[in-house]
A protein has these predicted regions:
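Beta/coil-rich, acidic/histidine-enriched accessory regions frequently appended to metallopeptidases
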Residues: 5-11, 54-55, 230-275
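Acidic/histidine-rich, surface-exposed loop or edge segments in extracytoplasmic proteins
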Residues: 28-45
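Structural helix-adjacent loops and short alpha-helical linkers that scaffold large soluble proteins
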Residues: 151-160, 212-220, 248-257
């Protein structure tokens, strides 16, 4: 039976809102949020930005599990920007955090509706996979941003389903190649086809979620919640992450799927999505 992205999202919401499921993974408390004001903001602007990022960080951890480290937010002004958050990037060192450039003239509602913070904060749920595995990290964050926005109540599952199906449909033609998936993704990145690289890579996590639902009756989000509690602090790279996924699921599917994306023909990998 074909499992759609919508059904995956619905299952995730059930897990998040079911205490008997989520409490087992919530061994650690929510991360402490630490703000660094890199430019001048008045008190009203600070309150709005803190409300936005605190709500987003909470929804992120309700989705993927509580982070076992403090989260640092570095806030810069971008008064001339035509959107609330024109730029954001993660900080990956001894400190785990995100740098945001923001235009504080936008409303709180516009900040909460923006995808940048869910995308960037979700990156921190997994160790930095390395520059050569950017397809993996960006596919992960792009997949998670929609689920976090649903948790925040900013979009319905149906709206995210429609958006994701459209994005996946648009990027499929770029992967009609006999070259390995990661080779095609890397070529798209070099040629600045970033949306196609991001959304094509989302399929890895669609496949993971669908396999988990069919084989174990759990979602990718539930697996991530378990992962934060047991393994996030110790894992250092992509191989560590996948080994942890194998161990937590008692299954080699995560490592087998990674091998398929590393060595399988791109067109064949893409054709398997949703089956």
């Amino acid at each position: 039976m074909k499992i759609t992205l919508l059904s995956a999202f619905v299952a995730i919401l059930i897990v998040v809102n079911n205490p008997s499921i989520s409490n087992s993974a919530s061994i650690i408390p929510p991360a402490e949020i630490i703000f660094h004001w890199e430019d001048h903001f008045n008190n009203k602007e600070k309150e709005k930005i803190e409300t936005w990022l605190n709500k987003t960080a909470l929804a992120t951890q309700q989705t993927v599990g509580n982070y076992p480290f403090d989260i640092h937010f570095y806030i810069h002004r971008a008064d001339n920007a035509k959107e609330p958050v024109p730029w954001g990037n993660t900080e990956r060192s001894e400190i785990q955090g995100v740098t945001f450039h923001v235009n504080p003239n936008f409303s709180l509602e516009e900040f909460l509706h923006d995808w940048t913070a869910p995308h960037e904060i979700s990156h921190l749920a997994i160790p930095f996979p390395g520059k050569s595995n950017r397809w993996f990290s960006e596919g992960f964050a792009t997949y998670m941003q929609g689920q976090i926005l649903i948790e925040m109540g900013e979009f319905t599952p149906e709206q995210i389903e429609t958006k994701y199906q459209k994005k996946l449909s648009n990027c499929r033609p770029y992967y009609q190649s006999d070259s390995p998936f990661i080779v095609v993704a890397d070529s798209l990145k070099r040629n600045h086809h970033y949306p196609e690289m991001y959304w094509g890579s989302v399929t890895f996590f669609v496949n993971m979620d669908q396999h988990l639902q069919k084989s174990e009756g759990k979602s990718l989000n539930e697996l991530l919640q378990e992962y934060q509690a047991c393994c996030r602090s110790n894992d250092k790279n992509l191989n560590d992450l996948i080994r942890s996924f194998d161990r937590l699921t008692n299954d080699t599917y995560p490592s087998d799927l990674l091998e398929a994306y590393r060595f399988g023909k791109a067109r064949e990998v893409m054709s398997e999505v949703g089956k």
